[in-house]
Amino acid sequence: MVLPAEIVTAAETADLDAVRAWLDGKPDGGRACINEHDEYGCTLLIACSLSANHPDRRVALARLLLERGADVNRCASDSHNDHLGRISPLHCASSDFFPSRDMLDLLLAAGGNVKAKTSGGAGYIETPLGRQLRTVRSMNYVYGPGGDFPSKVAALLRAGSELDDICVRAVSGASYMSAENLLRQFHQFINSIPGTNPTVIAGANEKCIEAGRMIQGVRAAGSWKAYIRRPHKDVCAVRGLVTKGFLAPPGGGSKYERAIAFVVKQGDNGIVWKVLSYWRADN
């Protein structure tokens, strides 16, 4: 079946009551048709992920749809109209217009595929991380409420996002870009805006650096898990040198260095391992 336009519109406007009433009116609670497309190739889950207004209602609606059997990886259909480019709900939630990562977290927890690529209908072939790093390069982000950008990058990296070949313009001869390429373009964009408040620029640059640090860390470590375990290796290395008398515990320095100093000064290995069991680089 083709989804009724008024129900898709209700999902787009985060009208939770209207969508719930329509689903409840079906013999099976809407489970048989919840993954169908409308005339433009859009599912209900995609529709409720396309905008950022009423974020709490949108997350509640997405949760309802998932409970009723919505496929988190059901992409937009190209059969009727290619303008959505086989976008997934996770691609939508990764865009810069979502001020928080609540929707992103919900879709990731439901099994959203971080490696899925669009088909280029919107002008780009990209993964959710590619879309996040590309769309954040906008005035809406620099001046808007997109302050959760590094946190979203962390969530996507934690879920296993790839770093290479994650975004390319859907034109002949274009080359795929890596996460570092996209972040470099974002940094250049920030610093090319004429007449921008220096405080705004500084804040955006800080977020860019924070995201870059995570991307570089995952690149060097080989995976998110290895990256967040890096402090453990650092502590063990410093502790071994301190124990053998080759190094004095670091004093002062950054918050990270002071944390290492605190841990290596503990004489009881049990205390050290207890601290390390709670310490993660993304906390």
Label each PLM-derived region with a short phrase.
Residues A14, A52-N53, R57, F97-P99, ...:
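Ankyrin-repeat intra-repeat helix-capping/turn positions
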Residues A154, V168-N283:
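Cullin-RING E3 adaptor/co-adaptor recruitment helices
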Residues A21-C33, L61-V72, D105-V114, A154-L163:
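Ankyrin repeat domain, specifically the short helix-to-loop turn at the C-terminus of the second helix
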Residues V2-E6, G85, D148, K233, ...:
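Alpha-helix N-cap/N′ positions at the starts of helices
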Residues A21-W22, A47, L64, C92, ...:
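Alpha-helical recognition domains of nuclear gene-regulatory proteins
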Residues V2-V8, A32-S51, C75-S95, K117-Y143, ...:
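Ankyrin-repeat boundary/"N-cap" motif
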